[in-house]
Amino acid sequence: MTMKELFAPSDMTVGKPWEKIVAFTIPMLIGNIAQQLYNTVDSIVIGKYVGDNALAAVGSASPILNLLLVLFVGISVGAGVMVSQYFGARQRKELSMTIGNCVTLTAISSIIIMILGAVLSRPLLEMLKTPDSIIDWCTSYLVILMVGCAGSAYYNILCGILRGLGDSISALIYLLVATVINIVLDIVFVSQFHMGVAGVAYATVIAQAISAVLCMWRLMRMIFDFRPKYLKMKKQYSMEIIRLGLPSGITQAIFSMAMVIVQSLTNSFGEMVIAANVIIMRVDGFAMMPNFSFGTAMTTYAGQNVGARRMDRVEQGAKQGTLIAVGTSTTITLLIVIFGHHLMGIFTNTTELVTLSANMMKILAVGYIAMAITQSLSGVMRGAGDTMTPMWISMVVTVVIRVPLAYGLAFLTRTPELPNGRYQVLWISMLVSWCMGALLTLIFYKKGNWKKKALTGSSSEK
């Protein structure tokens, strides 16, 4: 294979479905793992060089960070679905208009998020009853990342466009470059310049900005130019991006709000449980990467084949891709159960914290198999243009199941010795919600209403 062939967009409407899905997933999985290294390296450097309280500060800020970035999630998903379907349908003009409108929408959204982040970070942390011992660190970390959010926004959205075109290799390479920069800057800013959590935040902002520039350069060489006619907002494209992306943005917002609410419960258990939750979520980020990668691959695969009117091929790929994802997550579950203690020891030298984290991680382990089903089949539905069904499923499992279950179990397990209840309920509620999400996703996939949502042919600009 020549370099030109390696970096060419992948046509997923031909060839064996499982081979196309796996070939697309592998570089994306490596890229997602590298992206998770951003947060993991932050945690390791903070935990080793600053201390457990600083580690807890970064963890307490994360749910709010995710909540404020949901606009970008929506734009990314909406653009990715449109790009994959227009690419599959060979509609070049519509493809360029979609990308241009996406670039402009991202610029507007970045300005909004910068302002909201700078103004709301401290009040939100206070509302969540963040301990006084870590609130200043939390605020510093959040404000820096919010003010510098444009790089992160453009990187994630432009990567989504590249993947919609079938190019997961470029996204991988640019992310690896940024990850190396992030790791180096983390170590320099924290261990050499003693900048604490602020140093970690600055390192992340710089690295993601470099990634965004590289992605933009790739798109310019590949398919897109910056002539004003493409960057000018056009209602039919911008509204379609919002229509398709809004449900995913709402889904992420609901999940992030739930995380914020559950973080308030987590904070009530003290710094040790907060720090344990940070470590668990870092390991969880890696464990979930194959599921997210398969889900994104299935979105691109389904989008291109729906655009090409190959629904039989969509269903064939959905079955094969989901089975591979389930097998991968089963392996991960076994590794967590066997080696969980060693994994937690990477993040901290505190024996009690390692033991606590490892025991709680075992509660979650089997849930990754359920999430393999949810992510793969939700990806198929999104790729076909049905972004509403995954949103409603997420709302039910998060708002109706996870949050009430966490608080309800905490209340029911209160004793004079444990006035806030048992901390284990934090992860038990998550496991139950994951399993219910898989069941609901499977039911709605089988119903098949998602097959009627194709975009191509309805929004062409002749």
Please name every model-derived segment.
Residues A23-D42, I144, A178, A207-S211, ...:
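Transmembrane helical elements of multi-pass membrane transporters/channels
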Residues M12-V50, P63-G78, M82, A107-M114, ...:
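N-terminal transmembrane alpha-helices
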Residues I46-N66, D132-W137, V197-A198, E240-L244, ...:
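Interfacial/gating helices of multi-pass transporter permease domains
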Residues L55-I115, S152-A171, Q263, A276-G340, ...:
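Small-residue-rich hydrophobic transmembrane alpha-helices
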Residues M1-T25, V83-G148, Q192-L246, A302-G367, ...:
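Short alpha-helical transmembrane segments in multi-pass integral membrane proteins
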Residues L67-V70, N182-D186, S211-M216, F286-M289, ...:
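Hydrophobic transmembrane alpha-helices of multi-pass small-molecule transporters
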Residues S76, I144-R163, A171-T179, V200-C215, ...:
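Short runs within selected transmembrane alpha-helices of multi-pass transporters and secretion channels
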Residues I33, L37-A56, L125-D132, V188-M195, ...:
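Helix-terminus/linker motif at the lipid-water interface of multi-pass membrane proteins
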